[in-house]
Amino acid sequence: MSRRRRPEKREILPDPKFGDQVLSKFMNNLMLDGKKAVAEGIVYTALDTVEAKAKTDPVQLFHDALNNIKPQVEVRSRRVGGATYQVPVEVRPERAQALAIRWMISAARGRPETTMAARLSGELMDAANNRGNAVKKREDAHRMAEANRAFSHYRW
């Protein structure tokens, strides 16, 4: 254990257009090489596209999509007597949100559309409707946890 005190959590400023902290965190994760203006442009263009297609509040749809991706349980490796077990553990809310953001971005980057904004809007629409690669990733995590339920007594 570290002897130093735990650093306090940094307050993330909400995004300038919608005033949403989670959206700001999403942009920070999407950003490459410190180019925040590019990341903002991608996210705002994607949200405009979603608004035009779905005729709903884009920020609400974004939150619905993230909630559909958030995992409740995941498996973590635990060594017990020379064997490594995949032990299912519950996911803390902060980690669930971080995983959902990460999975959403990686699923969007893997899509075939031409621009990143188009890929992201497509993945947002899919995730809001409980389909797409990001939702599949969450279901895989839940399936792994269910398959390894026998080892849940090794939790720490």
Swiss-Prot record:
Q: Which UniProt keywords apply?
A: Ribonucleoprotein, Ribosomal protein, RNA-binding, rRNA-binding, tRNA-binding
* Recorded superkingdom: Bacteria
Task: Check the record and name the CDD domains matching this protein.
Answer: uS7_Bacteria (cd14869)
GO CC list? small ribosomal subunit
Q: Which InterPro entries match?
A: Ribosomal_uS7, Ribosomal_uS7_bac/org-type, Ribosomal_uS7_CS, Ribosomal_uS7_dom, Ribosomal_uS7_dom_sf
Q: Which family does it belong to?
A: Belongs to the universal ribosomal protein uS7 family.
What subunit structure does UniProt give? Part of the 30S ribosomal subunit. Contacts proteins S9 and S11.
- Keyword match Chaperone: no
Q: Tell me what this protein is called.
A: Small ribosomal subunit protein uS7
User: A GO term (biological process) for this protein?
Assistant: translation
Molecular-function annotations in GO: rRNA binding; structural constituent of ribosome; tRNA binding
SUPFAM superfamilies associated with the record: Ribosomal protein S7
Give a short account of what the protein does.
Answer: One of the primary rRNA binding proteins, it binds directly to 16S rRNA where it nucleates assembly of the head domain of the 30S subunit. Is located at the subunit interface close to the decoding center, probably blocks exit of the E-site tRNA.
